[in-house]
Amino acid sequence: MMSILREDEEGTLARLFTTPTDRTSILTGKFVAVFFTVILQGIVLMVAGRVAFGIHWGNPAGVALALLGQVIAATGLGVLLISFVKNTRQGGPVLGGGLTTLGMLGGLFTANIPGGMPAAFNAIGTFIPQGWVLKSWRMVLDGQTAGDLVVPFLVITAMGIVMFAVGAMMFRKRFA
């Protein structure tokens, strides 16, 4: 997603906008590229986890749903966060800060604390994609079926689509 900022700074984005291609289509193209890159990263990490550490990821259909939901949410969140950034220098701090904060609120840093976190803190995760992604992976690793993962998958996917749509609207206003 940083490529959009780089193209804006280098002037190539302005040239893209002079073509008959809709701005949302340009953003969707970036989204698709990131989507497939993140899927590939997930697969590589899962294979490495299996080979290096013997991790059994669970039911393949459940794994596919969890990974697909995670990727949709991650790419949608990436579009949303990058829409707040004005140049490449701001990209690292905004993306890093946003992802770290949401990861903490979603329970990614506290998932293995003995006794867990207070209920109010855990409730925050139900409003954040990272909380639902964590829930779906826990379900997969606990051996639940793909059918059990439908609700988390739909919630994660809906969040990803909404974040993408909001980010796309912000980009449309910015580059109108």
Tell where the protein language model's regions lie, with residue ranges.
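Membrane-interfacial segments
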Residues: D8-E9, A52, H56-W57, V85, ...
